[in-house]
Structure formats: C-alpha cells, structure tokens
C-alpha cells in the first residue's frame, strides 16, 4: 500500500504553499492518532489483564500464598507464575504446609538477605577461598556458611537435586547459591525476596568447576578414605560427590558423626544428580527437625518444589496458553509421561502396548468397542477427557489419537490426545528445549491423574509438584511389555535411585537401608528409597 502515498517530486513542486501545509497537517494528525490508538490499545490490554488477575485473586478457595508457603514480598508482574499457579490447578492441594515450615522459610529468607551475593558477609566469606589453608577448629567465619549447587545432568535431575540441597541448607542453616553458568537463571524466577540465589560468575572456586569429581583433593569421601580430615583441622571448602556413582564414603556425609565435622566447614560444593532427601532422615538430629517441618512425610518435594520453582514469564506463557487452548475445557485430564531408557530412543511397540495395557486395566482410558457395542448409545451427554502425552517421540500420542478417533469406545467418552512437543532426543542446556521441558512438567502437574515411566526424574518432578500419586510403568525387559504393566504408588515423593545400602550407626550396618526407619522404604517399581506416610 506504500505506493498509494508516493508523490513524485514534480507533483510536490506544483502544489501551492497552503496545500503543502494542509498535507503536512493531515499526515501529522494521522501519525499522532496512530500513536494514541496504539497507546490506548496497550493500556486497555494491560487493564484487561490486571482485571483478569484480580478476578482470579478474589476467587473463593484459591490461596495465592499456598497456606503461607510463599511470601507476599514480590511484585506479581515480574513473575506471574509465583502467585497464579494455583488458579490453573484442578483443585487446591489437600496438603498444607506446617506452621513450622512456614516459619523456617521466613527465617531462611532473612538469613539469605543478610548473607547473599553482594553483601558484606558474602565478600568476607569469599576472602579465605583464594588460598587453600586449613582452618583451626576455633576459627570463626561469621554467621554465614554456604552450600553451592552445581548444575549437572538433565532438567529433572537438576530440580530434584536443587530441592535436596535447599532442604540440607534449611537443616544446617547454610545459604544455598546456585550455579549460574547454565540456564537455571533463564528458566526460574528468584525464590527469595530482596536478594539472589544465583552464584556470582566471579566466585573463586568456579575456576575448578570441571575438576570436581571423586579424585578431587577436597572431596569429602576421598578425604575420609585417606584419613586426611579431622575435627581440629579442616579446609575452607569441601566438595560433596552425590552422583549415581557415589562410593559408601561419599554417602556418609548426611550421618550425624560426619555432620559434626562438616558443620565447621564454611563452604560446601555439591554435585548431585539424585534426590537424596530420604537419606537425610537417617540422621537422628535431622529426623527430629524434618518431622516438625513435614508431619506428612511424603510432602517434602511437593512443598519445596512449589516454594522454590516458579517458571519465568516466557515459560509460564507457554503453560497457560497450552492449558487454556487444549486442556481447560475437558471434564477430566490424564497425563502420560513416556521415557525410554535406551541408547536408541524412539518409538517401541512394546512400550505402546504397556501404556495401553496400564491405562485400560486401571480404568484411566476406556477399552475400544466392537461394532455391535458401538451401536449402543452409552450416554446422552458424553464426558470429555483430555490426554496429555509428553515424550521425546511423537509416535506414541499419534497412535493413541488414531486409536480413539477410528473406533468408538465402551464408555462413550470423547477422548482427545495432545502432545506439546516431540524433540526426538534430549537437548539439555539448550534454552528453548529446557523451556519446553519445564513447561511440560508443569502441564503434567495440572492433570487429574498421571501415568509415568519408572526411573524418570522428569516424571518425578511433575507428579510431585501436582500432589499426585502416579501409576508407575515398570521398566520393560527383553522388549516385552511387563505383566502387570504398572503399579499405583502410595506416595507422591520421588525415588532416591542410588541410596546408601545401610544406615549411619554401626549397629545399623547390618540392616538394609529400606528397613532402618519405617517411613523410608524401597520404591515400588525400582531399586531405591522413598518417603511414605502409610506404614
């Protein structure tokens, strides 16, 4: 349309002065009106959005602070998910945080504000890290002690270990600082008001980051084995190795005797890829405190995850848009999370068979009707069910979609199948991939029921955030669907996949770790430990 407004130089020259002035006034007026219209549109949209938020905030039964779990000291617009997650959930969580946990979190926030990055206390605490002298037992480093979390492995692992390390910080009055070299800062809002949990990039010990492993000279497990650490002389920092390949010596860090020594070290560096919370209950001192924090023992990650993890606005926009477009209008929502632990990922028929077998046996999805049965009108007003599938492979959702679109089912339900993405392979540390992964974890947590793959940290995060007790798909063996295909968990807690084999005290060394305390038992579907309320 630009050519309409083109006027040749000759025509311009031929116009009178008054005409030129008139044209200038007209165009100027149009320009001003356009700017005003755009401004009005933006203001209108902002007011409309604010009105929507206010309406949500006034919705009866919706507790924006989640029983005091969250503080009100944040600006809502800077992180929309923080206070508005509850408005998307199918119903308020029946699991309420204890008053003791709420009080502990408020105290922690004050401590983090005093000791966090940029404070005088932080600057003082980092002075001693430039040289590797040993500390004397009498030496004090002030009130601030720290635990640094290093980002490792996939997003599910990272969120589980972040919650684990934060709980350890709560129990030991340490400040948690988060490795800022990866994309955590691009995915999650700051959880503590008036400060930051992101480790400054100039932190002295980060120049050794690639060297933190079992062979590192300040690795606690290695120092134990070499008898090179004692209660009178200890280094200014220790590295805690809590990965899937941890040794027994590495796994002793949580024990009471070891903690009395570790407690004197001002800086701890944590590398972990497992949810080690269950082992903290083996320490009698920790156990007393944990019981007060979490009277309902299976709510640890449910509460800590909702306190710590608030997707940034860009991620939250993905969640809310997809939820409203595809899931919000359904009478019921079913989540199916599929992870194949093989070098060659992709679609496997025996996995598809297992998913169908589990969902139909457990009455989560209806069986298909025969030709005769399909002629029977089951219901005048059929119920609608949205099935949300998350997988690296899109074939699973396509097979389910075809299955229910081509034939009638026994209940007459309207089954709609959705899959937000199918990226074929995991792309950890790629910002867009991790944003999608986080969004899909939250979408799964918004479902009414969930079926999840055994051993999948992605699934652990989703159903624990949502307060859901999942149906866990057993690991297939020899390319065959297991029978039974799945088991209903009696706990919503994640599984600690590489736990210690025994408790802390010598009299417990002959006792299997799943029998040391009654509420820390073996996971239903795979070797590991998890927390249970039901005895």
UniProtKB/Swiss-Prot annotation:
InterPro entries: XG_FTase
GO cellular component, one term: Golgi cisterna membrane
Gene3D superfamilies listed in its UniProt record: 3.40.50.11340, 3.40.50.11350
Glycosylation sites: 136, 226, 230, 377, 409
Any one GO MF annotation of this record: alpha-(1,2)-fucosyltransferase activity
Main location, first listed in the record: Golgi
Keyword Protease belongs to the record: no
Transmembrane segment boundaries: 21-41
EC number annotated for this UniProt entry: 2.4.1.-
Expression sites (tissue/organ): Expressed in roots, stems, leaves, flowers, siliques and seedlings.
Metabolic or biological pathway: Protein modification; protein glycosylation
UniProt keyword terms in alphabetical order: Cell wall biogenesis/degradation, Glycoprotein, Glycosyltransferase, Golgi apparatus, Membrane, Signal-anchor, Transferase, Transmembrane, Transmembrane helix
Subcellular location(s) per record: Golgi apparatus, Golgi stack membrane
Name listed for the protein in its UniProt record: Probable fucosyltransferase 4
Topology Cytoplasmic: residue spans: 1-20
Protein origin, superkingdom: Eukaryota
Ranges of the Lumenal topological domain: 42-535
Gene Ontology biological process terms from the UniProt entry: cell wall biogenesis; cell wall organization; protein glycosylation; response to salt stress
Membrane topology: Single-pass type II membrane protein
Record flagged with keyword Plastid: no
